[in-house]
Amino acid sequence: KPDVLPFIDNLLRFVQAGSEVSALLGRMPSAVGYQPTLGTEMGSSQERITSTKDGSITSIQAVYVPADDPTDPAPATTSAHLDATTVLSRGLAAKGIYPAVDPLDSTSTMSQPWIVGEEHYETAQGVKQTLQRYKELQDIIAILGLDELSEEDRLTVARARKIERFLSQPSFVAEVFTGSPGKYVSLPETIKGFQMILPGXLDNLPEQ
């Protein structure tokens, strides 16, 4: 009863190959030039990756997003079959934040209170709400400046920036980018850190 962990890099190549074969067969292309059978082909390949009573199979797949457009048929069709997605952000990378994972666009079907626990779930929701509000305020900040925000919004921005930095806590895989040695931080410690940032217990500390 083997347990299998396949890595797929890159799933867009599978889609492009199907598109080329479809064109050679003379089929009429669908949206953005993809093959009309894209949904069927993707479903057929993804449904083969399933656990049975004889063993489990978990796949890690790299999905290139053309023009950073998540509504493109290729990534959109793929994401419908995934249990979790980790989305990398060019904006975070430009800020020097690594790993440049966007917590707002990333998803997981496991993020449920009966799976991860009530404390973990509520903390994660609080983090996402704070980051979402910060995202909504960025246009106002760019046009009018931070000083034009209300006191409450300025606190939200400061805490959101702390959260961004906290999410970049020194990981071993990011050593080459940050120059900081990797450090393991346990899940309970991470949750506790967020629980201190969200209510403002660390407002007196700088972002860094």
From Swiss-Prot:
Name of the protein in its database record: ATP synthase subunit beta, chloroplastic
Topology class, membrane: Peripheral membrane protein
A Pfam family: ATP-synt_VA_C
Gene3D superfamilies tied to this protein: Bovine Mitochondrial F1-atpase, Atp Synthase Beta Chain, Chain D, domain 3, P-loop containing nucleotide triphosphate hydrolases
Catalytic activity, reaction form: ATP + H2O + 4 H(+)(in) = ADP + phosphate + 5 H(+)(out)
InterPro entries cross-referenced by the UniProt entry: ATP-synt_VA_C, ATPase_a/bsu_AS, ATPase_alpha/beta_chains, ATPase_F1/V1/A1_a/bsu_nucl-bd, ATPase_F1/V1_b/a_C, P-loop_NTPase
Gene name as annotated: atpB
One function term, GO molecular function aspect: proton-transporting ATP synthase activity, rotational mechanism
EC number(s) on file: 7.1.2.2
